[in-house]
């Protein structure tokens, strides 16, 4: 009798386990996918600094390895901004295991180039560029001064030209300060280029209101295509849904669709935002999560899973 009871208990446990895994690995519907979706805002700016405490801040790094949008106060810098999609994700398919982790696409890869730049060489190139810009502005300034001398306030367009001349004067003033700081940095011979990234996600809470929270980057794949973000308090919203990556390959991407913040309903991958979830059609109007859209292609679910299980960044 005791043996029969043990066998019955074991049988019930097996049924419960099978039911759980079937439920957990069941394809996703649009409502669940929308609950997993977040919008990611990425802001980035750069800081040049030397050992004597001199600092300059810049909005972006261009393709010529030169910094744009200079400011000498951090509060005045205007960060570059990008918007992508992202989604909550479980660390394992065995059980709910999202500790505030989000997968998203890399919005800008200029940091790869920035990591290879030598600080002192960047200062030298930046100094030459700033001097050329200043010379060009001074030429405009001289022409505008001449115009304002030979024309009066009563002349048509005088006020517009005067306003433009004032803007040029302010730009010259800014460049003179930037050049002075760059010259000081060049003398120190030890300059660092720091990158500052700010990630903020937006999602709807249980009341349907938009909430925002800051995140840290904990992983980035070697090809600089996708990131794993984590909320600073490791919080996963109670009303959200975390995507589960199934433990088998999904190679057939035919009839795949994307779920994105851009549209209410699934759309073709081409029209979705980078960071959107990709699904392959299954049955009963459901889909199997199969990958993430990038700015140039997509990553499949196994590539995402590989990154999820790497060690976190320090």
Specify the residue positions occupied by each region the protein language model found:
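Short, low-complexity, Pro/Ser/Thr/Gly-rich segments in the mature regions of secreted, periplasmic
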Residues: 303-313
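Ser/Thr/Pro/Gly-rich low-complexity linker/stalk segments immediately outside membranes or between
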Residues: 24-37
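Positively charged n-region of N-terminal signal peptides that target proteins for export
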Residues: 1-5
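Short, solvent-exposed secondary-structure boundary motifs
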Residues: 20-23, 72-80, 201-211
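Hydrophobic membrane-insertion alpha-helices, especially the h-region
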Residues: 8-21
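Envelope-exposed proteins and targeting segments
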Residues: 34-36, 82-84, 98-100, 211, ...
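Catalytic histidine site
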Residues: 39-43, 51-136, 142, 149, ...
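Serine endopeptidase catalytic core focused on the charge-relay Asp
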Residues: 109, 125, 139-275, 280, ...
């Amino acid at each position: 009798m005791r043996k029969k009871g043990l066998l019955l208990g074991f049988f019930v446990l097996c049924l419960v386990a099978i039911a759980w895994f079937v439920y957990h690995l069941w394809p996703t519907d649009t409502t669940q996918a929308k609950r997993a979706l977040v919008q990611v805002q990425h802001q980035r700016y750069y800081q040049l600094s030397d050992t004597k405490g001199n600092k300059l801040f810049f909005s972006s790094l261009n393709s010529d390895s030169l910094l744009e949008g200079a400011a000498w106060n951090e509060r005045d810098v205007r960060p570059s901004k990008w918007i992508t999609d992202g989604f909550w994700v479980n660390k394992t398919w065995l059980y709910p295991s999202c500790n505030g982790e989000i997968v998203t696409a890399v919005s800008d890869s200029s940091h790869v180039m920035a990591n290879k730049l030598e600080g002192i060489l960047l200062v030298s190139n930046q100094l030459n560029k700033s001097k050329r810009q200043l010379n060009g502005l001074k030429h405009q300034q001289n022409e505008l001064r001449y115009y304002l001398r030979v024309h009066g306030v009563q002349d048509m367009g005088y006020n517009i030209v005067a306003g433009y001349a004032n803007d040029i004067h302010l730009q010259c003033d800014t460049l003179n300060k930037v050049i002075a700081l760059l010259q000081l940095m060049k003398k120190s011979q030890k300059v660092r280029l720091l990158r500052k990234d700010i990630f903020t996600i937006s999602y709807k809470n249980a009341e349907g209101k938009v909430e925002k929270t800051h995140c840290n980057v904990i992983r980035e794949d070697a090809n600089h295509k996708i990131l794993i973000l984590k909320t600073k308090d490791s919080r996963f919203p109670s009303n959200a849904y975390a995507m589960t990556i199934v433990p088998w390959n999904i190679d057939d991407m035919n009839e795949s669709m994307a779920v994105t913040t851009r549209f209410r309903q699934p759309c073709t991958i081409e029209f979705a935002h980078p960071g959107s979830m990709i699904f392959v059609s299954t049955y009963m109007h459901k889909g199997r999560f199969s990958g993430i859209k990038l700015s140039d292609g997509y990553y499949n679910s196994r590539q995402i899973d590989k990154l999820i299980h790497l060690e976190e960044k320090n």
